[in-house]
Each structure stands twice: as C-alpha cells, then as structure tokens.
Amino acid sequence: MAVLVVLLFFLVAGALGNEFSILRSPGSVVFRNGNWPIPGDRIPDVAALSMGFSVKEDLSWPGLAVGNLFHRPRATIMVMVKGVDKLALPAGSVISYPLENAVPFSLDSVANSIHSLFSEETPVVLQLAPSEERVYMVGKANSVFEDLSVTLRQLRNRLFQENSLLNSLPLNSLSRNNEVDLLFLSELQVLHDISSLLSRHKHLAKDHSPDLYSLELAGLDELGKRYGEDSEQFRDASKILVDALQKFADDMYSLYGGNAVVELVTVKSFDTSLVRKSRTILEAKQENTQSPYNLAYKYNLEYSVVFNLVLWIMIGLALAVIITSYNIWNMDPGYDSIIYRMTNQKIRID
C-alpha cells in the first residue's frame, strides 16, 4: 500500500511539475493568483483570449479574468524552456500555475487570427526555435529581424563578435569551447538581439496591430543531458537563464509601453503517450465511403436560393423586354410620342 502511495505521489508530481508563468502583463489583462492547473494544449487559447481573440472551445480556467475588453495588449511574447520543470523566478513579480498534460503546442492559431484580422497592417509575427533552426517570420518581422541569426553556424559566429553577450556574461563553470555550452549561450544571444533589433524600430511597437513572439529554448535541456541536472554547469546555466529572461521581459515590456504580455512555459519533458495517441488517430486509415451506384454529388445547401434568384431575375428581364417591344411596335408617333407631338404643334404655329 505504501508503495502505491509513493508511486501515485511521483506520478502526480511528474504530471504537475511543469509550470506556466506570467512574467509581465498590463493592467488590462488580469491573471489571478492561485494554484489552478492549466492543460498544456490550452495554452494557445490563453494567449488568444488575453489578446482579445475568440477560441473554438470555452476555457473554464479561473486563472485568466475578463479584464478590459476595449484595451487589449499590443504584443504577446511566449518563451518555452525545455529540460526543466521550473526556474527559480523571483517571488512577487511572477505568477505561476501548474502545467498538466504537457504536450507539444504551437501558436499557429493565434498567428492565423492576427493575419485574418490585421492583414492590411502587416503585424510582427516571429516564431523561432534556434536549436532546431526553425524560424517563421511574417509581416514586418521580415524587415525588422532580417539580420537575426537563425542557423547554428550563424549563432556560433554571432557569439564571437565584439558586441556579443559572451564578453559580458559571467560564464562560471560554462565553457566557450564546448558546443553544448555555446548552444545555450547562443539562445541567450537571440533573446538579446530580438529586443535590440526591435528597439531600432520602436514605431512598430506603437501601431494598432498586435504582435506575436514565440520562442523555444532547448539549450538548458542539452546541458542537462550532457552534464546532468545536479552538475555545476546546469545550476549556473539556470541562474544565467533566469537573469536573461528577466531582462528580456523587462526590455520587451518597456518597448511596448507596458502593454505586452510576457509568458514563460517550463517543460521537463513532453507527455509522449498523449502525442502518440493523437498521432494514431490522425494516421488511422480512412474508410472508403464511395458509393458503387455512381450517384450524383450532393449539391450545396445554397443552390436552391441562387437558382431561384437567377431564375426570377431572368423571367423579369424577359417580361420587361417583351412589354417594351410590344408598346414600341403599337406606338402612334403622332399621339404617343411627345417628340412628334411637339413638332406638329410647332409646325402649326409657324
């Protein structure tokens, strides 16, 4: 019995060990303090609702209040850190919630909502995963972040430039000669470069279209696999990452005039069982529903409406042409036409 209790404890701790944290948020977006767990697949819905967009399914999570519907944030910045369930964030300024059922997610739905509603204003949309060399830039992000390092070779070269963080960060036990350490440091360099490049285009943070930033950091996870989570390198990297995230949150929050939401997701590891289950459903063979009787396809429900509109318009035009032609054919120029009548009167007067 005691063994079952211990196993259940570790199971619950592993399921709820990850965290979803709010680093910065404006007064118009209200996040309540509490220990309410948030499902991992509903994090995009939290980001969408905080920006004022609608979602397909209602979110019955008490952590997010209604807030000011007429004053929404100008930007949402979400940073996901892999390899750690939680970071030693300063208490008081950060609101954290347990994250349950941590599955891979993306903010594509939020990006699509921004594109559909603000297509003419070309907002900034940046989704970046430096360790996987994945980048997605749309709108004004192409011009603002065109000099941003996105490949592993570019990240390595950026670190050894004169104005890089490598010359100012306290590396402690980290080494600049190790590829894993350089990967972690290059992700911190990306955070610094994003805020630095945006500071050169401050007018983009003051327009009316909302912006979206989604960043995935896996350098700490690689350090844990290389040195171990109890190693000095992992502890030093965690402290450096916390300081870098705090500075990045302050910079982005300040650039948007205090009207931005900065969110952090820390995931030790994703629940592969849930991912595998969803994949088996998507990869299931589709049944052949084609009828062997060569039946006609089902027409659109609006077909009858369009058909009646076209039919009666054509009938009305045909009747108008027939009536007009009949009247012209039987018209008496002397009496039915005002042109000839006026001409005859004028002739009589003359």
UniProtKB/Swiss-Prot annotation:
A motif (Mediates retrograde transport to the ER) lies at residues 346-350. Expressed in glutamatergic and GABAergic neurons with highest levels in the cortex, the hippocampus, the medial habenular nucleus, the cerebellum, the medulla and the olfactory bulb (at protein level). Phosphorylated. One of its GO terms (cellular component) is endosome membrane. GO terms for molecular function: signaling receptor activity. It comes from the Eukaryota. Residues 18-302 are extracellular. Residues 324-350 are cytoplasmic. It is a single-pass type I membrane protein. The keyword Cytoplasm does not apply. It is found in: Endoplasmic reticulum membrane; Lysosome membrane; Cytoplasmic vesicle, Autophagosome membrane; Cell projection, Dendritic spine membrane. GO terms for biological process: angiotensin maturation; central nervous system maturation; eye pigmentation; head morphogenesis; lysosomal lumen acidification; positive regulation of canonical Wnt signaling pathway; positive regulation of transforming growth factor beta1 production; positive regulation of Wnt signaling pathway. It holds the Pfam family Renin_r. Multifunctional protein which functions as a renin, prorenin cellular receptor and is involved in the assembly of the lysosomal proton-transporting V-type ATPase (V-ATPase) and the acidification of the endo-lysosomal system. May mediate renin-dependent cellular responses by activating ERK1 and ERK2. By increasing the catalytic efficiency of renin in AGT/angiotensinogen conversion to angiotensin I, may also play a role in the renin-angiotensin system (RAS). Interacts with renin. Accessory component of the multisubunit proton-transporting vacuolar (V)-ATPase protein pump. Interacts (via N-terminus) with ATP6AP1 (via N-terminus). Interacts with ATP6V0D1; ATP6V0D1 is a V-ATPase complex subunit and the interaction promotes V-ATPase complex assembly. Interacts with TMEM9; TMEM9 is a V-ATPase assembly regulator and the interaction induces the interaction with ATP6V0D1. Interacts with VMA21 (via N-terminus); VMA21 is a V-ATPase accessory component. This is Renin receptor. It comes from Mus musculus. The gene is Atp6ap2.
